[in-house]
């Protein structure tokens, strides 16, 4: 069972809530994904505006946990301020921390990220940092108080999948007891399955579902892929090899 900061969840698929064609399709996609956790952006959803109130009512109706994020923040100060506003509006200490360092790739700023994570952890937040796949940055985030890490698979919205499986595999081996979530860049269900086969605890999907021709069907596809990938990891899959190995025994074979 998936566990974040002492809370347990059945599904290992986290779903973003931005860019869907309509609120109804969003709701159907969340149900199809069987996700227990959805991410929301304070910059997109105001708890005071009517649209924000309608969105919040929809999320409550779905009965899922909410993980607010600091999307669009480029400085530690901006991210910390946004996180505090999110806590007031959504009533949770959880925060998906994003501090963007490059506008073209949306790559996280590792220095600003660690600074903001330290400030938020000291203030009682339970931080989910969106990060690159650097082990040293991961160490600094853990030292700052983070108990979950969210390395990217590829740039946000790119759909490229896992750009550096070696780095992700190394991070999994280096932090066997820290919940790890692949966040960003996943484009199709097979990418999610590959992440789960590496031993990752969960994946976070948004654009790949929201922008699909049929978001509801894609959400279901991701749910199945995440389950399949996790089962493969737990089943201890065979190692790849360069040469063939016969799978059919010779015992009882007729000699001609």
Swiss-Prot record:
Q: Which UniProt keywords apply?
A: Cytoplasm, Schiff base, Thiamine biosynthesis, Transferase
- A Pfam match is ThiG
A Gene Ontology molecular function term for this protein is:
thiazole synthase activity
Q: In which pathway does it act?
A: Cofactor biosynthesis; thiamine diphosphate biosynthesis
- Write the Enzyme Commission number(s) for this entry: 2.8.1.10
State the reactions this protein catalyses: [ThiS sulfur-carrier protein]-C-terminal-Gly-aminoethanethioate + 2-iminoacetate + 1-deoxy-D-xylulose 5-phosphate = [ThiS sulfur-carrier protein]-C-terminal Gly-Gly + 2-[(2R,5Z)-2-carboxy-4-methylthiazol-5(2H)-ylidene]ethyl phosphate + 2 H2O + H(+)
A GO-annotated cellular component: cytoplasm
Where is this protein found? Cytoplasm
Q: Does the keyword Transferase apply?
A: yes
Residues that hold 1-deoxy-D-xylulose 5-phosphate according to the record: 157, 184-185, 206-207
Q: Which domain of life is it from?
A: Bacteria
Q: Which positions are catalytic residues?
A: 96
Primary subcellular site in the record, as a coarse category = cytoplasm
InterPro entries from the UniProt entry: Aldolase_TIM, Thiazole_synthase_ThiG, ThiG
Q: Which SUPFAM superfamilies match?
A: ThiG-like
One GO term of the biological process aspect: thiamine diphosphate biosynthetic process
Q: How does it assemble?
A: Homotetramer. Forms heterodimers with either ThiH or ThiS.
Name the family the entry cites: Belongs to the ThiG family.
State the protein's purpose.
Catalyzes the rearrangement of 1-deoxy-D-xylulose 5-phosphate (DXP) to produce the thiazole phosphate moiety of thiamine. Sulfur is provided by the thiocarboxylate moiety of the carrier protein ThiS. In vitro, sulfur can be provided by H(2)S.
Report what the protein is called. Thiazole synthase
Source organism per UniProt? Brucella anthropi (strain ATCC 49188 / DSM 6882 / CCUG 24695 / JCM 21032 / LMG 3331 / NBRC 15819 / NCTC 12168 / Alc 37)
